[in-house]
Amino acid sequence: DFVYQFKGLCYYTNGTQRIRSVDRRFYNQEEFLRYDSDVGEFRALTELGRSWADDWNSQKEILEQKRAEMDTVCRYNYEETEVPTSLRRLERPNVAISLSRTEALNHHNLLVCSVTDFYPAQIKVRWFRNGQEETTGVVSTQLIKNGDWTFQILVMLEMTPQRGDVYTCHVDHASLESPVTVEWRAQSESAQSKMLSGIGGLVLGVIFLGLGLFIRHKRQKGPQGPPPAGLLQ
C-alpha cells in the first residue's frame, strides 16, 4: 500500500499585494516534489521526484498554468472567502469626470468617469442625470490592471446636455463607507463667458491693487536726503 498526497498553499502579504503559491507532493508522508512560485519551477526533494521535476519543467504549458494559479486560485480564493474586513487590503478609488469635447449645449457629447487605483476589483459605477439613473448610452472599458494589484476603469455616457442638467457619476466599492459621487453641470456658453470674465476681472483687480499699494508705499517713503555731491548738474 502507498499514500500519495498533494497540498496547495497560498501565502499573502498585505492582502494580495504579494502572493506566493506553493505546490507540495508527498509519497508515504515524505515530500518528494515541490513547486514554489518564488522559484518558478519544480524542485525534486528525493530521488523519486527527480523524474517528475525533469518532466514537468520541460513542459511550458504546465509551468504557465502554475504561474497563473496565483490569480486563478490564490487571488480568487482570497477575494471569495469571508475574510474579516480588517484583514483585507482595501484601496479607495479616485473618481473624476471629464468631457470628451468642448462643452456645447444641445450637441452630442461624451462624459467620461475615470475611476482609478482601487482594490479589490469588484466595483459598481453608475451614471445619473438629474437624479435619474441613465442605462442607455453607457459604455465601459474592461478592468485595467495597474501592475501594483490595483485597478482602473472608464465608464462613459453618451449625452446631449441641456441647460441646467446635472450629471452624476456614482461609485460603490468595498473600501467606501458610503458611495462616492462626482457631479458635472451643463452650462450655457454665456454662463461660461461670464464666469471667465469674472475670473479675468478678479485677476486684473488683484494686479491693480498690488500696483496701487506699491506706488503708495514709494510715495510715503519720500525723498531720502540730497543726492551725493557731483550728481547734481
Swiss-Prot record:
Annotated segments matching region Beta-2: 81-184
Classification via SMART domains: IGc1, MHC_II_beta
Matching PROSITE patterns: IG_LIKE, IG_MHC
Principal location listed in the UniProt entry: membrane
Record region (Connecting peptide): 185-194
Record key words, sorted: Adaptive immunity, Glycoprotein, Immunity, Membrane, MHC II, Transmembrane, Transmembrane helix
Extracellular topological domain: 1-194
Gene Ontology CC terms, in alphabetical order: cell surface; late endosome membrane; lysosomal membrane; MHC class II protein complex
Residue span, Ig-like C1-type domain: 93-181
Gene3D superfamilies: Class II Histocompatibility Antigen, M Beta Chain, Chain B, domain 1, Immunoglobulins
Keyword Transmembrane: yes
Region named Beta-1: 1-80
Glycosylation site positions: N14
Biological processes per GO annotation: adaptive immune response; antigen processing and presentation of exogenous peptide antigen via MHC class II; peptide antigen assembly with MHC class II protein complex; positive regulation of immune response; positive regulation of T cell activation
Segments traversing the membrane: 195-215
Subcellular location: Membrane
Top-level division of the source organism's lineage: Eukaryota
Pfam (any one): C1-set
Membrane topology field: Single-pass type I membrane protein
Cytoplasmic compartment segments: 216-233
Record keyword Ribosomal protein present: no
InterPro entries: Ig-like_dom, Ig-like_dom_sf, Ig-like_fold, Ig/MHC_CS, Ig_C1-set, MHC/Immunoglobulin, MHC_I/II-like_Ag-recog, MHC_II_a/b_N
One Gene Ontology MF term: peptide antigen binding
Protein's job: Involved in the presentation of foreign antigens to the immune system.
Family per record: Belongs to the MHC class II family.
Protein's recorded name: Rano class II histocompatibility antigen, A beta chain
Organism expressing this protein natively: Rattus norvegicus
Gene that encodes it: RT1-B
